[in-house]
Amino acid sequence: MNAVFIVFLSAILSYPHESFAEELATKHKHVEHCLGSDGEGHPLNEFWYDDGMCQRFYCFRDDEGIIYEQITNCPIAIAEGDCKINPGTAGSYPDCCPTVICPDSPKAF
């Protein structure tokens, strides 16, 4: 058991100086899609939406070639005083997000 652990530890310590993330980024620089949290492939630098959860998604590659998924949710709506929360409409983000309407303010914020 100790011999196996020592061999494993030696293998880890002798791993090349390039990190695992850097190696993956190098291997996947040609990839033009990302695997979204919905389990589907999506083109980089394009938005897609989950209307049921009122979320917007976006995949991009950083300067080092690592691909990230950005998930945007509705801001928290807090109504104080005479203000009221107006539920969002059906559809995609941001139209589905709730808004705060105040009687003394002509704009929703």
Swiss-Prot record:
Signal peptide stretch = 1-21
Database matches in InterPro entries: SVWC_dom
Q: Where in the cell is it found?
A: Secreted
Which keywords are on file for this protein?
Disulfide bond, Secreted, Signal, Toxin
GO cellular component labels? extracellular region
Does this entry carry the keyword Secreted?
yes
State a single Gene Ontology molecular function: toxin activity
Which tissue types show expression of this protein? Expressed by the venom gland.
Which Pfam families does the UniProt entry name for this protein? SVWC
Modifications after synthesis and translation: Contains 4 disulfide bonds.
Which family is annotated? Belongs to the scoloptoxin-16 family.
Q: What protein name is recorded for this chain?
A: U-scoloptoxin(16)-Cw1a
